[in-house]
Amino acid sequence: MTRFAKTLLTSSVALGALAATSPALAQATGDTAEEGGENAIIVTARRQSESLNEVPASVTVFTESTLRAAGIEKADDFAQLTPGVTIVTGTAEAGDTQINIRGINGARDAESSVALVVDGILKTNTAQLNQQQGTLRQIEILKGPQGALYGRNAAAGAIVIQTARPGDSLEGRVLVSAAEDNTYTANGYIATPVGDSAGLVVSGSYFHTDGFFFNRFLNDNVVDNQEVWSIDGRFVADIGPNTELDLKARYAKLDGASINFNASFHLPNFAGVDPDFFEDVNEHPFDYFSNIRPVNEQETVEFSALVRHDFEAMTLTAWGLYSDVDQLLIADGTSADFARFTFPAATPDSFAASISCFATTAELTGFPINSPTFIGNTPVPFIFDPVDGSTFGAYSPTTCDGTQLQIRNQRDFSAEVRLASNTDDSLQWQVGAYFLRIDRETGVSIGADLGQGVSRELFNPAGSFNPTSLLANDDFSTNVYAAFASIDWEVNDRFSVSVAGRYDIEDRSVSSLVPAAFDPFTGGPINPGQPVVNGVVQTLPDQSETFRQFQPKISLTYEVSDDMNVYANWGIGFKSGGFNNQGSAAIVDQNFNQFIGTNVLINDQFRKETSSAFEAGIKGSALNGAITFDLAAYHTTVDDMQFFEFFVGPFGLLRVVSNIDEVELYGAELNLTAEIVDGWTIYGSANVTESEIKANASRPITVGNESPYTADYTINVGTQFDLPVGDTIDFIARADYRITGPTWFHTVQDDPSPTLFSGLLPGSALMLPAAVGDADYSVTQRDEFGVLDVRIGLEIDDRFTVIAFAENLTDESYLNEVIPAIEFGGSFLSPGGLRRFGVEVAYDF
């Protein structure tokens, strides 16, 4: 454990003890949306309404008043206000979201580790994690395995969202805001009764920004620009004396940029030529100059129906959800330095690509790009032509990089039936069943850039304007069957026991959609995994597998006093295994294991992930709830943790999921809040997570390293004001400061590794030993950073609100994500948001 972590953990324990007696400290949960006795926050964390203080688990709650005060709209807003939770979203594309809770991360291209439940319905597509979900009323973030209660992919926790329901009278809200970088937001809702027993809510939102960054070559704001709009409808009706129908529909459309990354090198033996060949990722100056305009499109369609019927002693709930999310991205290629399109082969396409590559290089010789890369007189890699050659890096302004097109389209249908007790007895129970069908197509296509744009077809034959050179394209089908049950027993007035369990069966299959074709640039098959028999390319065979797991959970709660509870829980988390794009293992083996002897273990199928998690904690309050606190400690062992790997080489790029055999996680967490006077609240929280890779057959040298994407600690402090300054005017203000500790993003950390340059140098014009091309990844840890957000304004007559806001007020420079491409010899870096000032106006009616 680091010295800082030990100090913070010790301080947390001391603060927890102090909170029980001091009026200055308490838990950071925000204001109440639904209040019980003595202002208790009411939550549905266990699919039943109960006081937050009674829930035997760590739960962070954002109620309606807190959501408005903090300007929370999406997951990236509330994740930054939650201890032990970090998020990476929108770096590659809008639907690319990874949420990490206490060291368990949702690996890119695998399933999420966090369940998303909106108005009682489980959403299964990871692309929906950071979407707006309508008019928010309350958000609960549960930590630890929640699969027994909330369903699949809840190994790290669950996000439970409640949106606006129609009431007995007409109401609504309109909000507009304007900020720097041509950033505009508009959203609102209207809720109205329909007859005596029904009601309707319609919500809409719009967002536009030019983004923070600029493409110098294209002379346009096409790096992180985005335009999004959505409309949500909800119809709730009593269709019988004890029966309620809840219908929802949603449509959303996004257009923007993709692949907000720069490349950085970590080759220490080249630092004598240029120090930037061995660059600390935290010191990288971001600049953009690709010749291909990056594009990201996302379209979402959803329909759901939920029926709830109350019997005399039990409630039956049944729902169904149809979801269709299509995603596409277009961007520049990554591999000009490996000369895939540089030298002509015996095909017209290869000649055309080579001519374009040489011509654009000659035209752009000397054009300034990020050091240590440069555009020389020719596109020949400088290690083969030290006098006139080039070092492009990724996303250069020449056509030598090629192009990339990626799609991720998913349609799914899910349904659940749940029967739960509905009495005041000491024994409560629920039982149910769940079904899910997923049809998902993913594709990654690398094509030649002939200066004529990028095709939206994954496969473009030889002779086309954007001929395909490498293709991974698969259809994934999944059927999920699950049964679950739970029992909650109030043993006496102070002691309760809960037991829950869920059994999942996931049938998965994959079929390759890659045609049997040769690559016009390398002469091999369009997918290196395709066999060639008697000169004829063969299709990749179908694969299938079934994954099964029982997920038990046990929780204990003891009421020490009327104001203090202690609890403990243990549970098993589960994420199904699955398939990478077929041919991935062959690409890695041919380009890395056989060429430079890395012995990286990548399979076309990745294993299921399971975790065993234990948590114990204490929750308390004082002064009629004005002071609240909770302190928790946890330990988790993860077997076969799923981890995203990114490979770059002469083949282009490759995205795969691998497994880390065993990871140990443990830590502590503290939340404190105090209402100093009526209308003035202060709050704070801290999390420390220690992690260690215990076994990793995929990369054995990484044993002893930390869990990737896991911050060493997070600290949140803030204050909120709502004070009268006149008969009908209130002064409102909120400040939130979040510190995120050092973070590794890969299993390879303080480790050297051979790269493709190690294999190329001995045969190059430089004739250097292979070891000169080895990389050192000790410079890839993201540093600690802190972000301050401030909102100040007036509320008039409880209806009209004017707020000035600043995001990242101190203009802190930080990294959103680091993706080391180990055998490439560098990393792909995505920047965090810069400072932005704006004004927001809202009207309630």
PLM features per residue range, with description:
Residues 1-70, 76-82, 241, 303, ...:
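N-terminal Sec signal peptide and the immediately downstream disordered periplasmic leader
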Residues 32, 493-494, 628-638, 656-748:
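Gram-negative outer-membrane beta-barrel transporters
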Residues 304-333, 559, 565-571, 582-583, ...:
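Membrane-embedded beta-barrel scaffold of Gram-negative outer-membrane proteins
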Residues 212-222, 259-291, 334-405, 445-473, ...:
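Solvent-exposed loop segments that connect transmembrane elements
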Residues 44, 76, 80-121:
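Extracytoplasmic beta-strand/coil segments of soluble accessory domains associated
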Residues 738-757, 793-845:
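C-terminal beta-signal and adjacent terminal beta-strands/loops
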Residues 96, 112-113, 125, 134-137, ...:
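Outer-membrane beta-barrel translocator/receptor signature
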Residues 236-240, 419-422, 428, 432-436, ...:
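Structural signature of Gram-negative outer-membrane beta-barrels, strongest in the C-terminal barrel
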